[in-house]
Structure formats: C-alpha cells, structure tokens
Design a protein with these regions (language model features):
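Compositionally biased terminal segments of proteins
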Residues: 1-255
Length: 255
C-alpha cells in the first residue's frame, strides 16, 4: 500500500461518494486485496465526482493538506483543474497527492494560501484529456468498487483508462512530442498486470467510443513486446491475455 494512505483513508471516511482513486494506487489496492504483487507507487491519484462534491469535502481536504505540511502546492490553469501536493512533513501522509476536478472551484482556499503554477507534463495532459471526455468520465462514475473502505476504479474499468493513456502517449511521442518512454511502458504493463484479475466469465460493457479505443489498443499491442516474467505473471502468454480481453469487452466478433 502507498505510504501514508491509512491516515488519508481515516480522514475521508463519510466522503466515499465524492471521489474515486485511479491510477497506480487503485491498481496497488486492488492487487494487494487479491494478494498479487504490483509495482511501487508513491502518489495518490484522485478524481472528484463533481455531481456529488460538497463544500465540506473541499474544506476537509484543505485542512488535510495543511495538517500534512506539504511543502509544494501546485495548481494547473484552465477549465478543469489539477492539484499536486508533494513532500509532507512525515511519512504518515502520502508523498504525493494529485487531484483532478472538472470543476475548478472545489477547494475553499484561505486568504494566505499560496498555490504555484503546475507545469503541464505529458502525464497530466493525457489524463486531463481522458477525464474531460464524457464517455470515460461516465465509465469512471459507474465503474467504481470499494476496497477496504476506499472507492477505486474497478479492474475492468481501469484497463480501458490505462489502454487509452498508452495510445495517447504513444501517439504523442510518434508525433515528435517529448514523452517519457517509461510512462508509455508503465501503462502497457499495468494493463497486463490488471488482466490477471479477469477470468473467462468476466464481462464489461463499454460505450462505442471506448470499445473502439480498446480494439485499437489490442490491435497495436500485438506487435509490442511484453515481458510477462518480469511482471510476475506466470502460466499464460500475451496472446491468451489479449484474447481474454477481447472476450471480456465483447470485442471479438467485431475484430
């Protein structure tokens, strides 16, 4: 589990309908719950459900940030907002919290609050585009599950998010943008890690747009190398995993 996450969980009891954990932390919580290994991650990625958000949550979150003593408080600009808080005063708090809101005014700031501009890197830009997409945002709202009292995006819904991030970052790099290859590889590997939780009977309905993205991902991944052994995945191969993903999302008859 991410260092310091226990205190976070305790602080936000009662607000479970107002946010969902995505990204590496969601994967970590889900995999740990199934007693499977996952890569190390130090940041907590949170998406706010703007239809449910309350002023109380915003105030509680700001109090938590102050209590944790985060040294660096950053905020992006634009219609949607990214907030990043890093370097807390102790390991009782997550090293980094990244929070995304389609509503820029969810946090009630005090007069002396200082938020410095947040540089928009490839990861933030990609995630922002995905979460501002209505189809993916709807999947996020309907695809949640509870793991040890924490709302997280379920494995079958996390996989399309990871696949879309891989497609997006890969396309940007091919177009000449500066994109860290490690981030591209990370999303690809996470799809295969999460696929361990899918069985022959697992099914997930996707919107037409997301289904097309998943088909594109599975088609393009066919030419990619995936080192399953290094991911701790045994007893299967890449072809079997991709076939199971086609079946899970009902894509097989259309490929």
């Amino acid at each position: 589990m991410v260092s310091g996450f226990t205190k976070f969980k305790e602080r936000f009891q009662g607000f479970e309908n107002q946010y969902v954990i995505i990204g590496g932390t969601a994967c970590d919580l889900i995999m740990e719950n199934e007693e499977l290994p996952f890569r190390a991650t130090k940041d907590v990625d949170i998406v706010l459900i703007v239809e449910s958000i309350t002023a109380e949550f915003g105030m509680q979150f700001w109090e938590y940030v102050k209590e944790a003593g985060y040294e660096h408080l950053n905020k992006s600009t634009g219609n949607a907002q990214f907030y990043r808080f890093t370097s807390p005063k102790s390991k009782e708090y997550p090293y980094m919290i990244e929070i995304f809101s389609r509503n820029p005014d969810f946090i009630i700031l005090e007069d002396d609050a200082v938020l410095t501009p947040l540089p928009i890197d490839d990861e933030i830009s990609s995630l922002s585009a995905i979460l501002l997409n209505e189809a993916y945002y709807e999947l996020l709202k309907t695809g949640q599950m509870m793991v040890d009292g924490i709302p997280v995006l379920s494995p079958t819904c996390l996989i399309p998010f990871k696949a879309k991030a891989w497609l997006d970052l890969r396309e940007r790099k091919l177009n000449g943008e500066q994109v860290d290859s490690k981030n591209i590889k990370k999303h690809k590997n996470d799809v295969f890690r999460l696929a361990q939780l899918i069985t022959a009977n697992t099914r997930q309905v996707l919107s037409l747009e997301i289904a097309e993205d998943m088909k594109k991902f599975l088609s393009e991944i066919a030419d990619e190398t995936v080192d399953l052994k290094s991911l701790g995945i045994r007893g299967t191969d890449k072809k079997k995993i991709t076939e199971m993903l086609y079946q899970c999302y009902g894509l097989k008859d259309n490929t």
